[in-house]
């Protein structure tokens, strides 16, 4: 027998079972709930490179003076090629407004206290921005990243002078060399 919705009795029972299973799974999820606006800790901007997603999350639990519990579900995350390099380097000028508009929104909604800009070693976007020679060894790479990270800090400070800014270069093992 079909219902007016085109579902037979067995299909209807399967839909009901799926709904019960979904409700059961939802009830097992952590009950932590936050408002869309409020007082949150930070905004992290970093690169799209999949090698650094877990390492970046782990780093966020190690920031001096901020416990992992304080950061869990308590920071905005903006990901773009090159991370903070993508937000300021002329090679990626068409992306700049998107990042700065997002920062404005998270400042307005989330009342963040700091911005954390992390670039990383062996970054393809950095190579595109700076040229292969500028990142051909660790010293050159550090100098190129440092220049963009300084520009990033200056731009954040100009737009939002009350925010603190942490910048660094993440190594492929997850260690971050703080810059600035």
Model-derived regions: residue spans:
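N-terminal secretory signal peptides and thylakoid transit peptides that target proteins
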Residues: 1-20
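Catalytic cores of secreted/periplasmic or lumenal enzymes
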Residues: 2-7, 35-41, 49-54, 97, ...
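Short, conserved "active-site rim" segments that organize catalytic pockets and cofactor/ligand binding
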Residues: 15-20, 34-93, 170-176
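Bacterial N-terminal signal peptides
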Residues: 22-24
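Short HxH-centered metal-ligating active-site micro-motif
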Residues: 69-141, 145
């Amino acid at each position: 027998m079909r219902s007016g919705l085109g579902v037979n009795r067995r299909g209807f029972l399967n839909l009901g079972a799926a709904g019960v299973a979904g409700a059961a799974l939802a009830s097992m999820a952590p009950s932590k709930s936050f408002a869309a606006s409020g007082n949150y800790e930070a905004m992290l901007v970093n690169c799209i490179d999949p090698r650094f997603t877990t390492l970046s999350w782990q780093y966020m639990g190690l920031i001096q003076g901020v416990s992992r519990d304080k950061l869990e579900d308590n920071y905005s995350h903006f990901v773009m090629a090159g991370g903070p390099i993508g937000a300021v380097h002329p090679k990626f000028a068409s992306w700049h407004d998107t990042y700065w508009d997002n920062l404005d929104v998270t400042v307005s909604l989330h009342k963040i206290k700091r911005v954390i800009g992390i670039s990383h070693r062996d970054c393809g976007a950095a190579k595109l921005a700076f040229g292969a020679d500028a990142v051909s060894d660790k010293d050159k790479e550090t100098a190129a990243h440092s220049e963009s990270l300084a520009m990033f800090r200056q731009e954040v400070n100009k737009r939002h002078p009350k925010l603190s800014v942490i910048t660094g270069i993440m190594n492929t093992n997850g260690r971050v060399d703080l810059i600035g």
